[in-house]
Amino acid sequence: MTFIDKLSAAWQTQNSQLCIGLDPDPAKFPAHLQGKPDAILDFCKAIIDATADAACSFKPQIAYFAALRAEDQLEEICKYLRERYPHIPVVLDAKRGDIGATAEQYAREAFERYGADAVTVNPYMGFDSVQPYLERQDKGVIVLCRTSNAGGSDLQFLDVGGQPLYQHVAHLVADKWNTNGQCALVVGATFPNELAQVRAIVGDMPLLIPGIGAQGGDIKATVEAGRTANGTGMMINSSRAILYAKPDEMFAQAARQVALETRDAINRFCV
């Protein structure tokens, strides 16, 4: 099953367009996990088990693992997701961007080492930096477009042939790079006007939408701008607001409650 097929099925069977980010920060873990050698693995497994029925996808952020020399625990988490929740896509948030030969190694890392269904990539170096990912036709390639951070405007609004750069990227991906129907775009919830413009450009292409929760994006405005005609098409990501809803032994139950509330809030505006 391709990433797009798996995601489309998850939207329906899970009744969810909530993507749950896995950004483990041991400094925010509850006291009973502090100092344990497998704290990251135990924390993430508990979050996954508590929230899986509320999610259309999980998105581990590779930097949170690499900074702690915990890539082996990330491998275990991805394996755990594949084995326990094979119907839920795993998006490796890596935002890689490099020359073709190096990109090939990053693609192997994402899809062979971690077994991810999709990966985020940076398009700044052009097609040959993205091509190795696209060659895995069953995998998803999620391209940065209009990012949720304020500094994204430094580059993404630069004029490119009469349109801002982020719109040029949206056209480029939709018209030229998506020949296998495997692409998606990252567009921030913090910019609903631009989100609506990207949706108009790319049609039914899936959008990974960070920026709700801790970053302050409005769910109603996000859904109204990002949904497709049938009310789907989105992976609306929330990480910190779910992961760290409660800093004690009840952290997983609290995460579940926030995840369910967020999923339901998204669904209210999808009709």
UniProtKB/Swiss-Prot annotation:
Cystine bridges: none
Entry coiled-coil feature ranges: none
PROSITE patterns in the record: OMPDECASE
Cross-referenced Pfam families: OMPdecase
Pathway involvement of the protein, from the record: Pyrimidine metabolism; UMP biosynthesis via de novo pathway; UMP from orotate: step 2/2
InterPro entries: Aldolase_TIM (IPR013785), OMPdecase_AS (IPR018089), OMPdecase_type-2 (IPR011995), OMPdeCOase_dom (IPR001754), RibuloseP-bd_barrel (IPR011060)
Tagged with keyword Lipoprotein: no
Class of enzymatic activity (EC top level): lyase
Record PANTHER family: OROTIDINE 5'-PHOSPHATE DECARBOXYLASE
Protein name, as recorded: Orotidine 5'-phosphate decarboxylase
Keyword Lyase assigned: yes
A Gene Ontology molecular function term of the record: orotidine-5'-phosphate decarboxylase activity
Superkingdom assignment: Bacteria
Family statement drawn from the similarity comment of this UniProt entry: Belongs to the OMP decarboxylase family. Type 2 subfamily.
